[in-house]
């Protein structure tokens, strides 16, 4: 084996950055000279201001390209009525959030900062602390949510009360600029990050595509589609693969080359991206409740690998696509321009359009009467909820289980009212509630049977598909799971939630148990008391008859199913085993 001469390959060779930025300030930045070279001097205040503004902007606004993709759904004749309904709610939500009061999503995320510091940039040290201060200022001063829990020991936790710590990863590079990518990453989409350890045997055209489609199916709808999906094949290590997944889902690597070389440069496979996007459209899951728009786009990146390893990574950026670039150069501090007027994407005819027909449900009456009313309607039925709802999520359910395990029984409020899986952002002055959208239902699946056996949690409201144990529990105990659109948290806070108060465990912050009063709160029957599961009906390869039955009910509901060749593709491509 002959030795090759040394050659350094930039592992991620990107083309020129064409991102549009605005100038935040030219203060706190100066130019000096050292040993004949110009040095960019950056004061700590510059880093704090940059992080503060970037996370503020990303919490209330999204990229124009993302908003355009959402708007395109409204004009697509192949989009289902559900796709269009969800897209319209996203645009309305963005229009409210862009005012800077109610954030786009109630889960205002973990603050993640990736920084690349040029060798001729001097800060004097303490960069992480200065950036963390900016994150702190954003979450303290804006109406955001504190989602970070600190471990006191292996089992006891406490909310940090600031949303710190942030994840800050800084790298040294050439040049005289300091460049950043800031990500506000919610738990729902973060939890849809996966690593699979495979082998060379996977790397054939027939096997790889089918493999990636199978993995894509497992994402489900819990992380608020339409998604920006990223696949990464290869990597010098597992962690290198997953870091690339995260950045690819944020469009950070869009300017990579489209072919590889013998030195191991990363590249995008554009053709495979197109093929996978078509497969995503044919899954039938759509924008949360059935349709075409499971994904806006897909990125596939190929990396070099060790001969004994073939890591495959998958991740998503959700409908709250909160990614924003920033940079510091000799001219000042620059922040990526996000869309400040998302209302312009809403067609005039839809600006004041009503919400269509829905079954009105009065929640301020005995639970038995509410259950009796819901039992009259099939899965997919659209509802308008009015009255009292209990709000609780992960820790609240753990607390309730502890009570049951001690033989204490359940509090009456969990028996008398539906429970909404959610945790509110801070309430702005003059508002009844902060942004308050649903969290992922599946994390509470293990509690359902025990709760319902004691008369609690008979009606659950959240987002995403659920496991068979929930369907079985609802059939056994006469319960229901209702779906709420994941994403439009500002719309719900402004239009549907009229009062919010803490019922129990105030020390848990957003994880406390709350009570809300709602008007015209939209929901859909997803699992009923007869063992029917809406997602099972649209996903099963054996459910042609069920699809026809549900389609016949579409007059007053939100779901429209497909006919002809598109329906055949949907049925062929969605075996039930892929979803359970």
Curated annotation (Swiss-Prot):
Pathway membership, UniProt: Carbohydrate metabolism; tricarboxylic acid cycle; (S)-malate from fumarate: step 1/1
Keyword Transcription regulation: no
Induction info: Is expressed under aerobic conditions. Is repressed by glucose and anaerobiosis.
Superkingdom: Bacteria
The UniProt record lists the keyword Repeat: no
GO biological process, any: tricarboxylic acid cycle
Cofactor needs: [4Fe-4S] cluster
Catalytic activity entry: (S)-malate = fumarate + H2O; oxaloacetate = enol-oxaloacetate
Keywords assigned: 4Fe-4S, Iron, Iron-sulfur, Isomerase, Lyase, Metal-binding, Tricarboxylic acid cycle
UniProt GO cellular component terms: cytosol
GO terms for MF: 4 iron, 4 sulfur cluster binding; fumarate hydratase activity; metal ion binding; oxaloacetate tautomerase activity
Note on cofactor: Binds 1 [4Fe-4S] cluster per subunit.
InterPro entries documented for this protein: Class-I_Fumarase/Tartrate_DH, Fe-S_hydro-lyase_TtdA-typ_cat, Fe-S_hydro-lyase_TtdB-typ_cat, Fe-S_hydroAse_TtdB_cat_sf, Fe_dep_fumarate_hydratase, Fumarate_lyase_CS
Residues involved in [4Fe-4S] cluster binding: 105, 224, 318
EC numbers for this chain: 4.2.1.2, 5.3.2.2
One Pfam family of this chain: Fumerase_C
Binding partners and assembly: Homodimer.
Described purpose of this protein according to its UniProt entry: Catalyzes the reversible hydration of fumarate to (S)-malate. Functions as an aerobic enzyme in the direction of malate formation as part of the citric acid cycle. Accounts for about 80% of the fumarase activity when the bacteria grow aerobically. To a lesser extent, also displays D-tartrate dehydratase activity in vitro, but is not able to convert (R)-malate, L-tartrate or meso-tartrate. Can also catalyze the isomerization of enol- to keto-oxaloacetate.
Family classification: Belongs to the class-I fumarase family.
Listed PANTHER family: FUMARATE HYDRATASE CLASS I, AEROBIC, FUMARATE HYDRATASE-RELATED
Cross-referenced NCBIfam families: PRK15390.1 (NF011919), PRK15391.1 (NF011920), ttdA_fumA_fumB (TIGR00722), ttdB_fumA_fumB (TIGR00723)
Protein name: Fumarate hydratase class I, aerobic
Organism of derivation: Salmonella typhimurium (strain LT2 / SGSC1412 / ATCC 700720)
């Amino acid at each position: 084996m002959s030795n090759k001469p040394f050659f350094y390959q930039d592992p991620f060779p990107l083309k020129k950055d064409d991102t549009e930025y605005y100038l935040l300030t030219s203060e706190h930045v100066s130019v000096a000279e050292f040993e004949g070279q110009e040095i960019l001097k950056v004061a700590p205040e510059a880093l704090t201001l940059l992080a503060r503004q970037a996370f503020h902007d990303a919490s209330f606004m999204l990229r124009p390209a993302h908003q355009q993709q959402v708007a395109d759904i409204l004009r697509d004749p192949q989009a289902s009525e559900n796709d269009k309904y969800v897209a319209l709610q996203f645009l309305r939500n963005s229009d409210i959030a862009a005012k800077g009061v109610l954030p786009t999503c109630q889960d205002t995320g973990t603050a993640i900062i990736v920084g690349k510091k040029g060798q001729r940039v001097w800060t004097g040290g303490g960069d992480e602390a200065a950036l963390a201060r900016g994150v702190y200022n954003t979450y303290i001063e804006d109406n955001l949510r504190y989602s970070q829990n600190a471990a006191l020991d292996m089992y006891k936790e406490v909310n940090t009360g600031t949303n710190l710590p942030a994840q800050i990863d800084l790298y040294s590079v050439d040049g005289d600029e300091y460049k950043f990518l800031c990500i506000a990453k919610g738990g729902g989409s973060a939890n849809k990050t996966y690593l699979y350890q495979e082998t060379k045997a996977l790397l054939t055209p027939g096997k790889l595509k089918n493999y990636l489609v199978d993995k894509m199916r497992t994402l489900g709808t819990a992380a608020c589609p339409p998604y920006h999906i990223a696949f990464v094949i290869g990597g010098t290590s597992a962690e290198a693969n997953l870091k690339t997944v995260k950045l690819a889902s944020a469009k950070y690597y869009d300017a990579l080359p489209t072919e590889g070389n013998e030195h191991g440069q990363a590249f995008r496979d554009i053709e495979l991206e197109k093929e996978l996007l078509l497969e995503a459209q044919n899954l039938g899951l759509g924008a949360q409740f059935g349709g075409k728009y499971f994904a806006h786009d897909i990125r596939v990146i190929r990396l070099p690998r060790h001969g004994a390893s073939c890591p495959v990574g998958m991740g998503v950026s959700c409908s709250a696509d909160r990614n924003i670039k920033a940079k510091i150069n000799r001219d000042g501090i620059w922040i990526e321009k996000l869309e400040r007027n998302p209302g312009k994407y809403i067609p005039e005819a839809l600006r004041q359009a009503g919400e269509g027909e829905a079954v009105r449900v009065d929640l301020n009456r005995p639970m038995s009467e509410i259950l009796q009313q819901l039992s009259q309607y099939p899965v997919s039925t659209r509802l308008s909820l009015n009255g009292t709802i209990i709000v609780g999520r992960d820790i609240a359910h753990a607390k309730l289980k502890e009570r049951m395990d001690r033989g204490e029984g359940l509090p009456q409020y969990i028996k008398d009212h539906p429970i909404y899986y959610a945790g509110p952002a801070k309430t702005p002055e003059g508002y009844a509630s902060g942004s308050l959208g649903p969290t992922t239902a599946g994390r509470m699946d293990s509690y359902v049977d025990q709760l319902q056996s004691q008369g609690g949690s008979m009606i659950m409201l959240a987002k995403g598909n659920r496991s068979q144990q929930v369907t079985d529990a609802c059939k056994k105990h006469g319960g229901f799971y209702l779906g709420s659109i994941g994403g439009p948290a500002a719309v719900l806070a402004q239009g549907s939630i009229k009062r919010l108060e803490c019922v129990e465990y105030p020390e848990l912050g957003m994880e406390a148990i709350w009570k809300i009063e709602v008007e015209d709160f939209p929901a859909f029957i997803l699992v009923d008391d007869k063992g029917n599961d809406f997602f099972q009906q649209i996903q099963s390869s054996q459910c042609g008859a069920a699809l026809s039955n549900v389609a016949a009910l579409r007059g007053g509901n939100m779901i429209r199913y497909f006919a002809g060749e598109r329906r055949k593709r949907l049925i062929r491509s969605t075996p039930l085993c892929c979803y359970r």
